[in-house]
Amino acid sequence: MERYVVVMLNKAFEQVEVAIVSGFDDAFKYGQFMMNAKEDEYRDFFLKALN
């Protein structure tokens, strides 16, 4: 199973790497969870695949 780095973007568009998660679905859900939990802190998120 591939691993992904969940990268959060804060309000200043700085990248903040938060977690390494196994599986695309779990990584995406984690990014959405962090967006909802800290919506005043994060603007967006994206995933980077690890090889």
Protein language model features and the residues they cover:
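A short beta-strand micro-motif
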Residues: R3-N10
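Short hydrophobic transmembrane-like helices used for membrane targeting/insertion
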Residues: V7, I20-V21, M34
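Short linear/disordered segments characteristic of secreted peptide precursors
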Residues: A12-E14, D25
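Short, mixed-charge low-complexity intrinsically disordered segments
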Residues: Q15-V16, Q32-N51
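A structure-centric signal for secondary-structure junctions around beta-strands
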Residues: M1-R3, Q15
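GIY-YIG-like beta-to-alpha core
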Residues: A19-A27
